[in-house]
Design a protein with these regions (language model features):
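Helix-coil boundary and interhelical linker segments in multi-pass alpha-helical membrane proteins
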Residues: 1-10, 58-74, 123-134
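Transmembrane alpha-helical segments that form the membrane-embedded catalytic/substrate-channel core
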Residues: 15-26, 82-93, 145-150
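Membrane-interface helix-loop junction between the first two transmembrane segments
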Residues: 21-38
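A cytosolic-side transmembrane-helix exit/cap motif
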Residues: 30, 92-102, 151-163
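Juxtamembrane helix-loop boundaries in multi-pass membrane proteins
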Residues: 34-49, 98-117
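Membrane-helix exit/interface motif
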Residues: 56-66, 87-95
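Hydrophobic alpha-helical membrane segments
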Residues: 80-89, 103-129, 135-144
């Protein structure tokens, strides 16, 4: 592992932050009701993972391409996940912006808004041979995907017909 600025990390963070900043003004109706019931442990893990991932992707230059090798396939896979993440957001912003839209699957990926960026981080960690980012990505995934799955479960539970 080599310290140094990662422009790939910066690009990934921009791809994460820009749609989330737009989302802050386009949250689905009722989102706050779900957010106030979030599991505190999952929220803690999510926040720790977010902070660690944000720092780690910027400070290791190993995430930048270093010439051609088959290892670039890991980086390409991470980039594909991020492009799919952007497409997920485009679909959400063009939708009715409901809770169902927000917690929907995309291309068969469940709760895509949480799963795709976490998967991208894990693939980037493998590409950069960075165990710190791998651990941070796992922590982020447990928290972020866990929260989204809980919200999705609540949402699906509300839609079940009464017997």
């Amino acid at each position: 592992m080599h310290f140094g600025f990662s422009y790939v990390g910066m690009i990934f963070l921009l791809m994460l932050f820009v749609p989330n900043l737009i989302w802050a003004e386009n949250q689905p109706e009722g989102y706050e009701d779900y957010a106030k019931n979030e599991n505190r442990l999952l929220l803690f893990l999510e926040r720790i993972g977010e902070a660690a991932v944000t720092c780690l992707v910027l400070i290791f230059r190993d995430f930048n391409p270093q010439g051609w090798s088959t290892r670039l396939l890991w980086l390409a896979a991470a980039l594909v996940c991020m492009v799919c993440y952007e497409l997920y957001w485009i679909r959400y912003f063009r939708s009715g912006k409901t809770m169902e839209d927000f917690y929907s699957s995309f291309l068969g990926v469940p709760v895509a808004g949480a799963t795709l960026p976490v998967l991208a981080v894990l693939l980037l960690a493998i590409y950069g041979k960075n165990p710190f980012l791998l651990i941070a990505g796992i922590v982020l995934g447990i928290g972020h995907i866990g929260i989204h799955l809980m919200h999705r479960k609540e949402l699906v539970g509300e839609k079940k017909p009464a017997r």
